[in-house]
Amino acid sequence: GLAMAWAVLGPLLWGCALALQGGMLYPRESQSRERKELDGLWSFRADFSDNRRRGFEEQWYRRPLRESGPTLDMPVPSSFNDISQDWRLRHFVGWVWYEREVILPERWTQDLSTRVVLRIGSAHAYAIVWVNGVHTLEHEGGYLPFEADISNLVQVGPLSSHVRITIAINNTLTSTTLPPGTIQYLTDISKYPKGYFIQNTYFDFFNYAGLQRSVLLYTTPTAYIDDITVTTGVEHDTGLVNYQISVKGSNLFELEVRLLDAENKLVANGTGIQGQLKVPGARLWWPYLMHERPAYLYSLEVRLTAQTSLGPVSDFYTLPVGIRTVAVTESQFLINGKPFYFHGVNKHEDADIRGKGFDWPLLVKDFNLLRWLGANAFRTSHYPYAEEVLQMCDRYGIVVIDECPGVGLALPQFFNNVSLQNHMRVMEEVVRRDKNHPAVVMWSVANEPASHLESAGYYLKMVITHTKALDPSRPVTFVTNSNYAADKGAPYVDVICLNSYYSWYHDYGHLELIQRQLTTQFENWYKTYQKPIIQSEYGAETIVGFHQDPPLMFTEEYQKSLLEQYHVVLDQKRRKYVVGELIWNFADFMTEQSPTRVLGNKKGVFTRQRQPKSAAFLLRERYWKIANETRYPHSIAKSQCLENSPFT
């Protein structure tokens, strides 16, 4: 029934799903573009009314927020949950209101050949934006950017330099959001007040919300470079850079494209909206610890000259480009034709006080820890991370499995037509934003969905097929914890990603069973699918400072012993068809409260404050040993980051 209905709908969905208008280039400054950051303190107010609709009924967006009632100072970027001492805000579900007043430079408001854009890095989960009380933009889904041209609202007269931006954000998760959730009304009035409800989620991290990434204004000319798509290839020692450029605001234009190397020397140039640049003797983009000069980046400089009704304009945009190839065989993952082994981590965007708020000191610390560990990869579990994170990966050579917020797809009712269409749109937004990052080598469309369900099989097939159509240049996967014989989505992936928690959630305490159970799992999956396998999660909850020998659960010794048991099997299988291992997790992180979570998930090899547990040293020794093996050229580990290696 369900599959049949979908089979009929399939072509319709397909036709309307490629619906995204325009590009989402990262806002960079250039000769023709300016940025004005709106990070800092915003006015904030949560709507605590029973129906959460008071802000709309009283039209809080029509005048300054402080006139509607008491407001708080709220830092942006940050989650709002951990900032105040109000327990209601910590657990709030519903609409919150943010507001910021800014003064624009006159050249933005008076020069009609300037286009002014408001960009929001992310707002979790549904956002409505007003500028000077005028409804401007709505966006569904956290973790991804959205923007609006607000020129006609700010170029309207002598007082137009004063701009008031109001953003209402709702963090409620329903059966059609990504991630999904359910709202449960508790009606037993002997226990609960009237109208009492809770938000149920089906994933293991705290549902932080707010303006968690930067908000900014930027300008372009009225005719502008709207999007650039780059794919790269290698023929012998010549690098190939294929580009496609879209221009908006003019039909009369010329494009010049220049490719510069890291020393700013011109290595190739071209013209027009698409073409191929050839780079003889190209320096390839290699992962960290795979080459003595990893992460080599070129710059693609695009120059637009266009005719508009107001006369000629020019626009400039520079895109970092890494020349590299990715391929998958039945037992290997190849980067630039060489076998690549993922030795890395799963992460979360999570820290004390700021929650999921973007933070430069934290980001740089995390990258220093990744390099210290000898990690060459991570997965963006379980949502796309901030754009600045991926830019760091490009620069440091850290390989990324880029995951969308398809987590917690645990119930049959979550696999419906509306969700499917929403999921496909989200994949379009992810690919549109992240397609040009050389560090991104694979898309992940979901984490631990209920993939044994018939409806899930069709759903995953549609999302994966759609993602491959959006970007044929990268493999696509989802991360499974289903049984190999029951998984309905696995036939459609390029790489099998397996989560398993032997002797933690299953046969807990029995470390002696891990080798047998893990070996059986790998062999069953490989026999069935003949595809490379990544151990995409494994680990143990560890309270720092708990010690016991022989090892007991929750101690540092147990985490180490569990890892060692996994590593015995991983060492046997990585010589065959296992192409990676990602520990769960890089650092401890916050979850919903439950009797099994002691102030969050404690499976990190670092604490939430980024200090090492015993297992971090074990993992570091292993990752550097793998990196130092003979299959990488010998000079590498010596010349690269000597201070990081435990063996120097």
Swiss-Prot record:
Glycans are attached at N170, N269, N417, N628. Keywords: Glycoprotein, Glycosidase, Hydrolase, Lysosome, Signal. GO terms for cellular component: extracellular space; lysosome. This is Beta-glucuronidase. The keyword Ribonucleoprotein does not apply. Inhibited by L-aspartic acid. Residues 1-19 form the signal peptide. InterPro entries: Beta-gal/glucu_dom_sf (IPR036156), Galactose-bd-like_sf (IPR008979), Glyco_hydro_2 (IPR006101), Glyco_hydro_2_AS (IPR023232), Glyco_hydro_2_cat (IPR006103), Glyco_hydro_2_CS (IPR023230), Glyco_hydro_2_Ig-like (IPR006102), Glyco_hydro_2_N (IPR006104). Its EC number is 3.2.1.31. GO terms for biological process: carbohydrate metabolic process; glucuronoside catabolic process. Plays an important role in the degradation of dermatan and keratan sulfates. It catalyses: a beta-D-glucuronoside + H2O = D-glucuronate + an alcohol. Belongs to the glycosyl hydrolase 2 family. Its main location: other. The keyword Hydrolase applies. The active site is at E448 (proton donor). GO terms for molecular function: beta-glucuronidase activity; carbohydrate binding; signaling receptor binding. It comes from Chlorocebus aethiops. It is found in: Lysosome. Homotetramer.
